[in-house]
Amino acid sequence: RPVARGAAIPRYRAGAPPADFVHGGEGFGDLPAKQPAGKPDNRDAAQFLCESCAAHPGEVIICAVGPLTNLAAALDHDPSITQTVKRVVLMGGSAARHGNVSDCAEANIWNDPDAADAVFGADWHVTMIGLDVTEKTQCTPEDFATLAESAPVIGGFLEQASRFYFDFHEAKTGKRSCFMHDPSAIIAVTDPGLFRYERDPVTVV
């Protein structure tokens, strides 16, 4: 499956340092990141997204689980992506709840608010899975142990990587469980009927 290189920095401001105290130095807890066997697509992420949606109009669902820099760049590259994409599902924001990097800001939006405002302001179907949703979906070490047992290679890797994340949450909340932020957005793509939705305008300030 093709992988395209994304933007290195936010749209109009300096990038924040990675949250290695939450996810570890490479994003996998204490585990090292493995070098990929293949090479990235020759196109950057913005071009790749636009061309993929144009090639399959009305079929592609984009699920964004990080800052929205690449989606905003795709809007700049080809504004017609709003007509060719089926919908956008993103993990980010916080509706009627606190933030996780400040009193009101969620990390993915906070890391590139200009891009987020462009994405929310575009004329396409956006589903926001915010902290008000993801902090209700929690997993325990036992859940990951079951995953490792049922899928030893991938599940075993996730079980090992999750230990760092459990340590972070336990130090913060006193409970050995963790919020399932990004997986909640993915589940909203694969099984949208598990969620209840509200239609509201969103602006990033």
Which residues are covered by each model-predicted region?
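N-terminal acidic, glycine/proline-rich low-complexity segments
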Residues: 1-205
